[in-house]
């Protein structure tokens, strides 16, 4: 081992090895596929509790509600959601 070496394999040696690509040829596409399915099925909305894009506004509304009284905001929004 050379002086100052940490004993780790050089990055170039890892990336050019067959073993690296055999492992990563399966794992990398799997990660992207899992992420795509997590978002496209709507499970991400359910997991993090965020509203779905069609649930931000009620059908009768065309824009975001405006709160007119700062300290009455909760009651104004509660009235809107009923």
From Swiss-Prot:
Binding, heme = 24
Q: Name one GO biological process term.
A: photosynthetic electron transport chain
Co-factor note (free text): With its partner (PsbF) binds heme. PSII binds additional chlorophylls, carotenoids and specific lipids.
Which residue spans traverse the membrane? 22-36
Which superkingdom does the taxonomy of this entry point to?
Bacteria
Keyword NADP listed: no
- One GO cellular component from the entry? photosystem II
> What residue stretch is flagged as signal peptide?
none
Q: Where in the cell is the protein located?
A: Cellular thylakoid membrane
**Single GO molecular function:** heme binding
Q: How does it sit in the membrane?
A: Single-pass membrane protein
InterPro entries attached here? PSII_cyt_b559_asu, PSII_cyt_b559_asu_sf, PSII_cyt_b559_N, PSII_cytb559_asu_lum
UniProt cofactor(s) = heme b
Q: Which Pfam families match?
A: Cytochrom_B559 (PF00283), Cytochrom_B559a (PF00284)
Keywords in alphabetical order: Electron transport, Heme, Iron, Membrane, Metal-binding, Photosynthesis, Photosystem II, Thylakoid, Transmembrane, Transmembrane helix, Transport
Q: What does this protein do?
A: This b-type cytochrome is tightly associated with the reaction center of photosystem II (PSII). PSII is a light-driven water:plastoquinone oxidoreductase that uses light energy to abstract electrons from H(2)O, generating O(2) and a proton gradient subsequently used for ATP formation. It consists of a core antenna complex that captures photons, and an electron transfer chain that converts photonic excitation into a charge separation.
Indicate the quaternary assembly: Heterodimer of an alpha subunit and a beta subunit. PSII is composed of 1 copy each of membrane proteins PsbA, PsbB, PsbC, PsbD, PsbE, PsbF, PsbH, PsbI, PsbJ, PsbK, PsbL, PsbM, PsbT, PsbX, PsbY, Psb30/Ycf12, peripheral proteins PsbO, CyanoQ (PsbQ), PsbU, PsbV and a large number of cofactors. It forms dimeric complexes.
Q: Which family does it belong to?
A: Belongs to the PsbE/PsbF family.
Protein name per its UniProtKB record: Cytochrome b559 subunit alpha
Species of origin reads Prochlorococcus marinus (strain MIT 9313)
């Amino acid at each position: 081992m050379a002086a100052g070496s940490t004993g780790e394999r050089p990055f170039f040696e890892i990336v050019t090895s067959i073993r690296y690509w055999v492992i990563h040829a399966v794992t990398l596409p799997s990660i992207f596929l899992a992420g795509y399915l997590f978002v496209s099925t709507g499970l991400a909305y359910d997991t993090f509790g965020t509203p779905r894009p069609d649930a931000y506004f009620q059908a009768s509304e065309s824009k975001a509600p405006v709160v007119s009284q700062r300290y009455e905001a909760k009651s104004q929004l509660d009235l809107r959601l009923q």
